[in-house]
């Protein structure tokens, strides 16, 4: 909410008023909270000029209003060293006002504070453990003696004395809310100490605890706070204030939290209806429950009614078969906008399925405003992380910005889970010094605990966004090193997938949207799926793997819905890589499949086409397809804009085979005299999978030999127990003999005829797309550049021209 951000937005003359309500208003009595110099619970320090502006004198009692409608009374003192618009207060006052350093509080004069007759003060239980003796003499008497301290009912204050500090809470004051403790005030401190849990629970959420929904928050505050606080605004213009807000968004994005924050901050009466709770078995009972809720809210106006999970009580009437549901929907409709107007009652609904709500509810006058609480972007995630980690003990080097970059598609709840997981990880590391049986844990162990970057990284590895829970996404642990050869393919892939995710601003600079799809084709066993796995691992995007045949189901129209759902999930957790393995099973040419399940395959393909390049806005969703029958794939899929990069993954040449041997045997113990080069030379025409198989087989022989040796040695030891074990086996390793043995069984999985087919296909693609090989801009010198083009087939281009003449 800084002013710089606002000014940078308004460069282009027109100011964006959508978040105007969130800006801080400038006023003389709004002061910025600063750390106190001398620690006193009843004193705040102001600059003399500020005091003059507010017409305060030294020693005046003032009323300070903080967040969540908290206020307190203190004595104002002048302090030359305090900056101009700041106010210095210590931690106790800050916690009573629920503010942190740098927040804004408002200061008001409070001339009519009476001397108190009686005050009732109780200690908080965990601060007096193990204390004996009279609390009053030790703590309260020296604190209040001759001090004339103002007190506010409900405040806490901390008293230091005798090596201890005890926290007290003001339970009652007489007279009224505020009073000054004078020498003749009676102080009661009898009674059960206040429990810390009851104390903490009151401290509920405010606007500060909701992150990543700044624009939506502004809309909600316009609709809720303005009518509740200043109804005359709407009266003077002559419109009725809006009555209903529907919040929708994926689970865990903070819909209920926002409603709670609004209730706490506005001070309105808050009535929460959980959808299923109002149902009852008696006829007419459920409707009367609803009516009672609305009556209750009108009695306590201004008030907010919050209906959580509204889709459970207001489903579409034509779809539901129960009589009760229909009656409840009708009752809700009449209550929200019936003949009786409802005054000062705002209805908020929350759901994650806005389309299953009865459409009559979604018109103006009932739920006027539908606010989409979506998945937060990077800035929003940083805000949310800041909120969740503000009470955590973080190590210095924790880089929240980095984490917010790595958590694409996480909603608020996922980020909270991430923080908890990181903290748990920190505790697990300290498990060796903790003992569960002990009653207490050493203070130094507790103090040494801090959550570091590594903990967050481990937590990131185990967590995934909740939008992807059911299509569970295992990021495979395959890296580029596991793939032998294919250097230019790797580069092409990195450009396609990693550039738009890592430096997206480059694409904006050049004014192009990045390409969205890649199709690998080539003989089986050349590493198409492996490449996709590596891409998922290397780039920071989420990864959904879709097996082609899984999408088809027996129900009519279900297969298309599956495709749609997958794309929706991918969009929610963008940037995301969708990998379709065996693409030819669902993308065969249309019209070729006659009569299978009413042409289900064709319909799935049509759905795929519209999803990939339809009219809906694109998020960063990449599509990688892999197939070994590229000739039967529908040509509409292969046009630029859908799968525009067609990458032929050939059988590996000698260098690549050498790389594959190396990659396979990275972790195996090899004997010195194995020559991988020679192996690579001999395996002409083998695919990557065949090469891997050779390695596995050699490995198997080595293991067999090793086990036989062990058995042999065991036998000898039993026959001759006295002999020393002088013949310790050399390190077990794979020897050339094993490879020679395994080469006897090696076989090629791809025949020459197949390869010719693939090459012919690649060739036709090259020609069909290669019209522009001869193209040069007019002014470049011709000869030098023409030679540089590898595909310069001038005669082929000339032949092609005959087709069009």
Curated annotation (Swiss-Prot):
GO terms for molecular function: ATP binding; ATP hydrolysis activity. SUPFAM superfamilies: ADC-like, Cdc48 domain 2-like, P-loop containing nucleoside triphosphate hydrolases. ATP binds at residues 249-256, 522-529. Gene3D superfamilies: 1.10.8.60, 2.40.40.20, 3.10.330.10, 6.10.20.150, P-loop containing nucleotide triphosphate hydrolases (3.40.50.300). InterPro entries: AAA+_ATPase (IPR003593), AAA_ATPase_CDC48 (IPR005938), AAA_ATPase_domain (IPR050168), AAA_lid_3 (IPR041569), Asp_de-COase-like_dom_sf (IPR009010), ATPase_AAA_core (IPR003959), ATPase_AAA_CS (IPR003960), Cdc48_dom2 (IPR004201). Pfam families: AAA (PF00004), AAA_lid_3 (PF17862), CDC48_2 (PF02933), CDC48_N (PF02359). Residues 783-805 are annotated as: Disordered. Keywords: ATP-binding, Cell cycle, Nucleotide-binding, Repeat. Belongs to the AAA ATPase family. Probably functions in cell division and growth processes. This is Cell division cycle protein 48 homolog. The gene is CAFP.
């Amino acid at each position: 909410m800084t002013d710089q951000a606002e000014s940078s937005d308004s460069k282009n003359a027109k100011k964006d008023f959508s978040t105007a309500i969130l800006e801080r208003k400038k006023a003389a009595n709004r002061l910025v909270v600063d750390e106190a110099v001398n620690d006193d619970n009843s004193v705040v320090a102001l600059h003399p000029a500020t005091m003059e502006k507010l017409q305060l004198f030294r020693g005046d009692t003032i009323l300070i209003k903080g967040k969540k409608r908290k206020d307190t009374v203190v004595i104002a003192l002048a302090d030359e060293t305090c900056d101009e618009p700041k106010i210095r207060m210590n931690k106790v006052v800050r916690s009573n006002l629920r503010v942190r350093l740098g927040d804004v509080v408002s200061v008001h004069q409070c001339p009519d504070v009476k001397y108190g007759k009686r005050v009732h003060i109780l200690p908080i239980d965990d601060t007096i453990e193990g204390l004996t003796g009279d609390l009053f003499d030790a703590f309260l008497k020296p604190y209040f003696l001759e001090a004339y301290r103002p007190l506010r009912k409900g405040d806490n204050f901390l008293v230091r004395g005798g090596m201890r500090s005890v926290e007290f809470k003001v339970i009652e004051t007489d007279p009224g809310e505020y009073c000054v403790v004078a020498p003749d005030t009676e102080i009661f401190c009898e009674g059960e100490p206040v429990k810390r849990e009851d104390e903490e629970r009151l401290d509920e959420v405010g606007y500060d605890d909701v992150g990543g929904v700044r624009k939506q928050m502004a809309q909600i505050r316009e609709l809720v706070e303005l009518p509740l606080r200043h109804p005359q605004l709407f009266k003077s213009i002559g419109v009725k204030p809006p009555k209903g807000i529907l919040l929708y968004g994926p689970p865990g994005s903070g819909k209920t939290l926002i409603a709670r924050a609004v209730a706490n901050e506005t001070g309105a009466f808050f009535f929460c209806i959980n959808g299923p709770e109002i149902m009852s078995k008696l006829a007419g009972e459920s409707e009367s429950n609803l009516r009672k809720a609305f009556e209750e809210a009108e009695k306590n106006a201004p008030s907010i009614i919050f209906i959580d999970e509204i889709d459970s009580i207001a489903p579409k009437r034509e779809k539901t078969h129960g009589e009760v549901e229909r009656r409840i929907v009708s009752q809700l409709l009449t209550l929200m906008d019936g003949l009786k107007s409802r005054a000062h009652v705002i209805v908020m609904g929350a759901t994650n399925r806005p389309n299953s709500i009865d459409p009559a509810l979604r018109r103006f006058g009932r739920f006027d405003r539908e606010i989409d609480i979506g998945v937060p972007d990077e800035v929003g995630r940083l805000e949310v992380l800041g909120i969740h980690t503000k009470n955590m003990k973080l190590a210095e080097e924790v880089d929240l910005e980095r984490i917010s970059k790595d958590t694409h598609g996480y909603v608020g709840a996922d980020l909270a889970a991430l923080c908890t997981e990181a903290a748990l990880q920190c505790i697990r590391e300290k498990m060796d010094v903790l003992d569960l049986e002990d009653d207490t844990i050493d203070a130094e162990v507790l103090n040494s605990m801090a959550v570091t970057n590594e903990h967050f990284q481990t937590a990131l590895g185990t967590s995934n966004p909740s939008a992807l829970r059911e299509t569970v996404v295992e990021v495979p642990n395959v890296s580029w090193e596991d793939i032998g050869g294919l250097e230019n393919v790797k580069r092409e892939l990195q450009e396609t997938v990693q550039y738009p995710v890592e430096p997206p601003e480059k694409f904006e600079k050049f004014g192009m949207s990045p390409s969205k799809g890649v199709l690998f084709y080539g003989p089986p066993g050349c590493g198409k799926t492996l490449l996709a796995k590596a891409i998922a691992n290397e780039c920071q995007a989420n990864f959904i793997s879709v097996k082609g045949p899984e999408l088809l189901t027996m129900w009519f129209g279900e297969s298309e819905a599956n495709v749609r759902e997958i794309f929706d999930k991918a969009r929610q957790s963008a940037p995301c890589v969708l990998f379709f393995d065996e693409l030819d099973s669902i993308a065969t040419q249309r019209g070729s499949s006659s009569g299978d399940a009413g042409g289900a395959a064709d319909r799935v393909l049509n759905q795929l086409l519209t999803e990939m390049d339809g009219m809906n806005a694109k998020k960063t969703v990449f599509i990688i397809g892999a197939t070994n029958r590229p000739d039967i794939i529908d040509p509409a899929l292969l046009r630029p804009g859908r799968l525009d990069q067609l990458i032929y993954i050939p059988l590996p040449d000698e260098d690549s085979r050498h790389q594959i041997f190396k990659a396979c045997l990275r972790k195996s113990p090899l004997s010195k005299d194995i020559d991988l080069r020679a192996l690579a030379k001999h395996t002409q025409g083998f695919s990557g999978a065949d090469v891997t198989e050779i390695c596995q087989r050699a490995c198997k022989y080595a293991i067999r030999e090793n086990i036989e040796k062990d058995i042999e040695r065991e036998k000898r030891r039993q026959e001759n127990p006295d002999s020393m074990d002088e013949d310790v086996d050399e390190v077990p390793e794979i020897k050339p003999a094993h490879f020679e043995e395994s080469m006897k069984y090696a076989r090629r999985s791809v025949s020459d005829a197949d390869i010719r087919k693939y090459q012919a296909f690649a060739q036709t693609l090259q020609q069909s797309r290669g019209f522009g090989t001869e193209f040069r801009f007019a002014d470049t010198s011709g000869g030098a550049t023409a030679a540089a083009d590898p595909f310069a087939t001038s005669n082929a281009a000339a032949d092609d021209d005959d087709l069009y003449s």
